[in-house]
Design a protein with these regions (language model features):
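Positively charged, small/polar-rich N-terminal and surface patches that mediate targeting and assembly
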Residues: 1-108
Length: 108
């Protein structure tokens, strides 16, 4: 199993979730986060915004589904041409074990 963390722009999170659900990947966890990447925030006039609002999605999937999920997120979350700074990041981690609390059982 893999755990995919996707940091996307807030205005893209609904579209990403819908595309994932339409492809059969409806289970995810979402929360609001703030941070900055290479651009270190933005400056508007004299105001400097060090951190930008983003949404983080967490998706646990089978190894075989990882590439399709990543492709869906990248295609849906991109706001313009390739290389547009600030569109987000995707991180993939291995999942060693998973448990369902209600049944107190280890998942396969």
């Amino acid at each position: 199993m893999k755990m995919i963390y996707a940091i996307v722009r807030p205005e893209k999170v609904y579209e990403v979730n819908k595309a994932l659900a339409d492809a059969g990947y409806g289970a995810s966890t979402k929360w609001s986060v703030a941070g900055h990447g290479k651009q270190h925030g933005i400056q508007v006039g004299e105001l400097v915004y060090d951190e930008m609002s983003k949404n983080m999605l967490m998706i646990v999937c089978d190894d075989d589904d990882k590439n399709e999920i990543i492709d869906i997120i990248m295609d849906t979350a991109q706001t313009g041409e390739s290389g547009n700074s600030g569109d987000g990041r995707i991180f993939v981690l291995p999942v060693e074990e998973s448990y369902t609390i209600s049944s107190q059982s280890k998942d396969d």
